[in-house]
Amino acid sequence: MLMNTAEYLSIIENIKSEITVAQYRAAIHVNADMLLLYYDIGCVINEHKSWGNKFIDNLAADIRIAFPESKGYSVRNLKYMAKFAEIYPDREFVQQVVAQIPWGHNIVLLDKVADMDERKWYIKKSAENGWSRNVLVHQIESNLYQRQVLADKVTNFDHRLPSPQSELAVQTMKDPYVFDFIPFREDMLERDIEQALVRDVTKLLLELGTGFAFLGNQYHLNVGGDDFYIDLLFYNLNLRCYVVIELKTGDFKPEYAGQLNFYLSAVDGILKKEQDNPSIGLLLCKSKNNVVAEYSLKDISKPIGVSEYKITSSLPDDLEKQLPSIEDIQKRIK
C-alpha cells in the first residue's frame, strides 16, 4: 500500500505536531528546572552576604572541583544568581513567569531593565515571539516598551473599532517607530524611505510586531476607473484585518487623514472579505502635533492611528543573523 493517502498524510502531520509540542515542553521544563536551581543557589548566597565576596569565590572554586564538566557556575554567574533571587523574591513567580525565557535572556533583563512591569512585559514578548538574546537587547535599547506601552498614542480606534479589536490595535501600535536599518540622508523622499523599508522587509516586520504579513508596496487599487497606489499594504493575522500604511517625510497635516480614510474605504470595498475585521490605517510622519492630529481624526469615519518615525542607522551588524526569516515569521503567525 502506498502511504500517500490523505488519511496517512494527516496522521503524519498530527504526529509531527505532537513531537514538536513535546520537544518544546521538554525544553521549557529543562529551562525551568535550571532557573529554579539558579534561584535557590542565589537565595543561599544572599542568606550568607555577611561572609563577604570570598564566599562566592570559594563556592565557585568548590563547585568547579566537584563538577568539572559543568558550566555556568563562575563567580560572575553566581553573582547574577544572587541578583536574580534578590529581584524575584517569589519562587512561584520565577517558575511560572520568568522560566519562560532562557538564563541568558534573564541576564540581559537584570542588566538593562530596572522596572518590574517593564521586565515582565519583555519576558512575555520574548516568549511569545521567540526573540533571540540579541534581538531582545535591540528591542530594549530601542525603548520598545516605552514606545509600545507607555506612549501617548493618537488614534480613533476606541470610537471606530469594536472591542476587543480596538484594544489590540492600540497595543500593537508604537510611537515612534524606529527604522534603524535605513541609511539616513537629510534629503530622503517618501519613496526613498519606502523602498528602503521594502528592501529590508524582515527587519520592517520585526519593528511592526507579531502578526504582520507584507502584501506589497505601491499597491494598486482601481476605483471607478481611476488608479491609486497605497504606500505599504499588510495583513495582520492577530487583528484579522488589512493594515494600510502611508509614509510622510514632513510634519503631519490634516489632509493626510482624509487621504488615508479614502484608501481604507477602497480596501474595505475591494479587498476585505466577510470574515475580515475593518481595515486599519497607520499614518507615519516625521513629526506631529498631537492636538492637531487628534482633531483631524475626530470625525474621520475609518480607524486611523498617527505615529512618528525615526531613522537612526544604528542596527548592530551582528543582529542580521539573529533576525527570523520571512518564512519563520509566517510560520510563527499562522
Task: Describe the function of each predicted region.
Residues 1-334:
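Basic, low-complexity intrinsically disordered segments
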